[in-house]
Curated annotation (Swiss-Prot):
GO cellular component, one term: Las1 complex
Catalytically driven reaction(s): a 5'-end NAD(+)-phospho-ribonucleoside in mRNA + H2O = a 5'-end phospho-ribonucleoside in mRNA + NAD(+) + H(+); a 5'-end (N(7)-methyl 5'-triphosphoguanosine)-ribonucleoside-ribonucleotide in mRNA + H2O = a (N(7)-methyl 5'-triphosphoguanosine)-nucleoside + a 5'-end phospho-ribonucleoside in mRNA + H(+); a 5'-end triphospho-ribonucleoside in mRNA + H2O = a 5'-end phospho-ribonucleoside in mRNA + diphosphate + H(+)
Protein name: Decapping nuclease RAI1
Localization per record: Nucleus
Domain of life where this protein originates: Eukaryota
Length: 396
């Protein structure tokens, strides 16, 4: 069975259910996951602190590049196992021993791909979908995703000069470096002078992650999304209410010196809007660097204002492929979620499914995965035995 969804499909509503954090978990410097809510909030959250006086052109975003502690790609996937471990603990300890009331459980990054797809038609998508216990579980296919990352990297190495490839890798590093110099491990008042002043010397890594798990949805669909949060803008409320409004996204990009660069930045800004909007994160800070990787400027954007910035950009008025429209993207996203919930029976555990977008044919499809693939996903790759045992115990 293969079904196709037209790229012109649009849901009638763009009503997004107000995102609300229900718990968080973290990955530490050693790649181990932390689930204890108090430890996660006390020890794994970063706080934004970068006064204007520090942005004087002396912050080098490639300093420490040679010592970058980079997590291997195979360990840096959207890991469903750790999400299900965290979800089990939440249901057992904070949800009266009941399963969370949602239709779909997945990662924010994967939904960002779907939301942004109408304006990113060159990016392939391959997601696996399982029905279990009345809910859909969606994750990237690890084998396909890893092979794709490897192929892309090899292609870049072959098509670029060594200098250009090195520059690209330093661009990637500069984003993590910006996070390191723009954040503190605790609120400013609780940090020592050394913690504040020595951030530029801190070893940069992409192991550490703070992951917020929220309840949200679009239209009639209720969803649970897990997504990385870069830092806290000010403080975390003691009562834990409306914590999402205190989170912030950090990004870096090259300084804008031409119309073409402004147009490319708009594409980045659209993707940033998509990932923040889905999580209910209201602020984004962009660090602008020069070609020598020195930080030249910092700009704060409010997530809710980005659609208007894009709409009012005169440079993209007559753009081929159409002007980016955030409402159109939301209506597409709503149509995809609606379609998946209609087409996949949530009580059928005999099949798994793959959702794919093929840029070469511009087709968005859903097909059944039978036999071995279904078994592989249900027995370890997506669903864990511990999670299934927990859910079976509360069905009895």
């Amino acid at each position: 069975m293969m079904k196709t969804l037209s790229l012109q499909s649009r849901a009638k509503t763009t009503a997004l259910k107000q995102p609300k954090e229900i718990f968080a978990f973290a990955r530490d410097i050693d790649g181990e996951f932390v689930y204890d809510q108090k430890i996660v909030k006390d020890e794994n959250v970063s706080y934004y602190y970068l006064p204007d006086s520090k942005i004087d052109g002396s912050i080098d975003l490639q300093a420490g590049y040679a010592k970058f502690k980079k997590i291997p790609e195979e360990k840096n996937m959207s890991d469903m196992k750790c999400l299900l471990t965290a979800l089990t603990k939440y249901e057992q300890e904070h949800n009266n021993g009941e399963k969370v009331n949602v239709d779909i459980i997945t990662y924010r990054g994967l939904m960002t791909k779907l939301l942004a797809l109408p304006y990113n038609l060159n990016d392939p998508v391959d997601l696996n979908v399982l029905a279990y216990d009345g809910q859909l579980f969606i994750n990237s296919d690890e084998e396909i995703e890893l092979a794709r990352r490897k192929e892309e990297d090899e292609h870049k190495q072959q098509s670029m000069t060594p200098e250009k490839y090195d520059h690209m890798k330093r661009c990637e590093f500069s984003g993590y470096k910006f996070e390191a110099i723009a954040t503190l491990p605790k609120p400013w008042a609780d940090c020592s002078r050394q913690q504040i002043d020595k951030r530029g010397k801190k070893m940069v890594n992409n192991y550490e992650q703070y992951i917020s798990v929220i309840k949200t949805g679009i239209g009639e669909a209720k969803m649970l999304l897990a997504g990385e949060v870069d830092c806290v803008w000010d403080y975390i409320p003691e009562d834990g209410k409306d914590v999402l409004s205190h989170y912030m996204e950090l990004k870096t990009t090259r300084i804008l010196e031409s119309n073409g660069q402004v147009v490319n930045f708009e594409k980045k800004l659209f993707k940033t809007w998509a990932q923040c909007f889905l999580m209910g994160i209201r602020k984004v800070v962009y660090g602008f660097r020069d070609d020598s990787f020195f930080l030249r400027d910092v700009e704060l954007y409010k997530t809710e204002e980005i659609p208007l910035l894009i709409k009012n950009n005169a440079l993209t008025e007559n753009k081929s492929g159409g002007k980016i429209n955030c409402t159109t993207a939301l209506k597409w996203y709503g149509a995809v979620i609606e379609w998946l919930l209609q087409e996949i029976p949530r009580d059928d555990t005999s099949k798994a499914y793959r959702v794919s977008f093929d840029p070469s044919t511009r087709t968005f499809t859903l097909r059944e995965l039978m036999g071995n693939e279904n078994s592989r996903l249900r027995n370890g790759e997506m669903l864990t035995s511990e999670f299934k045992q927990w859910r079976e115990s509360i069905q009895k």
